[in-house]
Protein backbone atom coordinates (compact mmCIF):
# COMPACT_ATOMS: atom_id res chain seq x y z
CA UNK A 1 0.00 0.00 0.00
CA UNK A 2 1.15 3.50 -0.82
CA UNK A 3 -0.33 6.78 0.41
CA UNK A 4 -0.24 10.35 -0.88
CA UNK A 5 -1.54 13.52 0.77
CA UNK A 6 -1.91 17.14 -0.33
CA UNK A 7 -3.30 20.25 1.33
CA UNK A 8 -3.88 23.64 -0.28
CA UNK A 9 -5.33 26.98 0.74
CA UNK A 10 -8.63 27.44 -1.08
CA UNK A 11 -7.82 31.14 -1.51
CA UNK A 12 -4.67 30.25 -3.47
CA UNK A 13 -6.60 28.18 -6.02
CA UNK A 14 -9.37 30.80 -6.12
CA UNK A 15 -6.82 33.53 -6.92
CA UNK A 16 -5.20 31.51 -9.73
CA UNK A 17 -8.60 30.62 -11.17
CA UNK A 18 -9.85 34.21 -11.10
CA UNK A 19 -6.64 35.35 -12.84
CA UNK A 20 -6.50 32.64 -15.55
CA UNK A 21 -10.09 31.33 -15.78
CA UNK A 22 -10.78 28.34 -18.01
CA UNK A 23 -7.15 28.20 -19.17
CA UNK A 24 -6.19 27.22 -15.62
CA UNK A 25 -8.90 24.56 -15.46
CA UNK A 26 -7.89 23.12 -18.84
CA UNK A 27 -4.32 22.60 -17.59
CA UNK A 28 -5.33 19.98 -15.02
CA UNK A 29 -8.99 18.98 -15.40
CA UNK A 30 -10.84 17.19 -18.17
CA UNK A 31 -14.20 18.62 -19.30
CA UNK A 32 -15.96 15.86 -17.28
CA UNK A 33 -14.02 16.84 -14.16
CA UNK A 34 -14.76 20.53 -14.67
CA UNK A 35 -18.47 19.73 -14.36
CA UNK A 36 -17.80 18.65 -10.75
CA UNK A 37 -16.77 22.19 -9.72
CA UNK A 38 -19.43 23.79 -7.51
CA UNK A 39 -17.34 26.42 -5.72
CA UNK A 40 -13.71 27.33 -4.93
CA UNK A 41 -13.56 24.63 -2.23
CA UNK A 42 -14.43 21.83 -4.65
CA UNK A 43 -11.93 23.18 -7.19
CA UNK A 44 -9.20 23.20 -4.53
CA UNK A 45 -10.24 19.67 -3.52
CA UNK A 46 -9.80 18.45 -7.10
CA UNK A 47 -6.34 20.03 -7.26
CA UNK A 48 -5.36 18.42 -3.95
CA UNK A 49 -6.74 15.05 -5.11
CA UNK A 50 -4.62 15.01 -8.26
CA UNK A 51 -1.52 16.08 -6.34
CA UNK A 52 -2.14 13.41 -3.66
CA UNK A 53 -2.70 10.76 -6.35
CA UNK A 54 0.63 11.60 -7.99
CA UNK A 55 2.41 11.57 -4.63
CA UNK A 56 0.98 8.12 -3.83
CA UNK A 57 2.86 6.90 -6.91
CA UNK A 58 6.05 8.39 -5.48
CA UNK A 59 6.66 10.59 -8.53
CA UNK A 60 4.49 13.71 -8.24
CA UNK A 61 3.16 15.44 -11.35
CA UNK A 62 5.89 14.98 -13.97
CA UNK A 63 6.62 13.29 -17.30
CA UNK A 64 5.82 9.91 -15.70
CA UNK A 65 2.38 11.03 -14.49
CA UNK A 66 0.51 14.02 -15.87
CA UNK A 67 -2.63 15.59 -14.45
CA UNK A 68 -4.54 13.79 -17.21
CA UNK A 69 -3.30 10.35 -16.11
CA UNK A 70 -5.50 10.88 -13.05
CA UNK A 71 -9.28 11.04 -13.33
CA UNK A 72 -11.54 12.19 -10.50
CA UNK A 73 -15.26 11.39 -10.57
CA UNK A 74 -18.09 10.66 -8.14
CA UNK A 75 -19.62 7.30 -7.24
CA UNK A 76 -23.32 6.55 -6.86
CA UNK A 77 -23.24 7.92 -3.28
CA UNK A 78 -21.51 11.13 -4.44
CA UNK A 79 -18.19 10.14 -2.85
CA UNK A 80 -15.01 11.02 -4.77
CA UNK A 81 -13.58 8.28 -6.94
CA UNK A 82 -10.08 7.99 -8.41
CA UNK A 83 -9.01 6.27 -11.60
CA UNK A 84 -5.53 6.22 -13.12
CA UNK A 85 -4.85 5.85 -16.86
CA UNK A 86 -4.24 2.33 -18.16
CA UNK A 87 -0.54 3.12 -18.55
CA UNK A 88 -0.17 4.28 -14.93
CA UNK A 89 -2.26 1.35 -13.64
CA UNK A 90 -0.03 -1.10 -15.51
CA UNK A 91 3.34 0.60 -14.89
CA UNK A 92 2.70 0.96 -11.14
CA UNK A 93 0.80 -2.34 -10.77
CA UNK A 94 -2.25 -0.69 -9.17
CA UNK A 95 -5.15 -2.95 -8.21
CA UNK A 96 -7.17 -0.67 -5.90
CA UNK A 97 -7.51 3.03 -5.16
CA UNK A 98 -9.15 5.06 -2.43
CA UNK A 99 -9.63 8.84 -2.33
CA UNK A 100 -10.86 11.13 0.43
CA UNK A 101 -11.31 14.90 0.03
CA UNK A 102 -12.22 17.35 2.78
CA UNK A 103 -12.51 21.14 3.13
CA UNK A 104 -12.39 23.14 6.35
CA UNK A 105 -11.26 26.51 7.66
CA UNK A 106 -10.00 27.73 4.28
CA UNK A 107 -8.11 24.59 3.28
CA UNK A 108 -8.76 21.58 1.07
CA UNK A 109 -7.03 18.28 1.77
CA UNK A 110 -6.96 15.01 -0.12
CA UNK A 111 -5.59 11.62 0.83
CA UNK A 112 -5.06 8.79 -1.65
CA UNK A 113 -4.26 5.16 -0.87
CA UNK A 114 -3.29 2.72 -3.62
CA UNK A 115 -2.61 -1.00 -3.59
Swiss-Prot record:
Key words, A-Z: Cytoplasm, Fatty acid biosynthesis, Fatty acid metabolism, Lipid biosynthesis, Lipid metabolism, Magnesium, Metal-binding, Transferase
Subcellular location: Cytoplasm
Catalysed reactions listed for this entry: apo-[ACP] + CoA = holo-[ACP] + adenosine 3',5'-bisphosphate + H(+)
Signal peptide: none
Domain of life: Bacteria
InterPro entries noted in UniProt: 4-PPantetheinyl_Trfase_dom, 4-PPantetheinyl_Trfase_dom_sf, ACPS, Ppantetheine-prot_Trfase_dom
GO biological process terms on file: fatty acid biosynthetic process
Chief location bin: cytoplasm
Function: Transfers the 4'-phosphopantetheine moiety from coenzyme A to a Ser of acyl-carrier-protein.
HAMAP family reported in the protein's UniProt record: AcpS
The name this protein goes by in its record: Holo-[acyl-carrier-protein] synthase
Amino acid sequence: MRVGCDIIAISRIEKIHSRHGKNFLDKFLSPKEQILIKNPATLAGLWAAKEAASKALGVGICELCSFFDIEISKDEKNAPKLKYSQKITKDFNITQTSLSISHDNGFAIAIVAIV
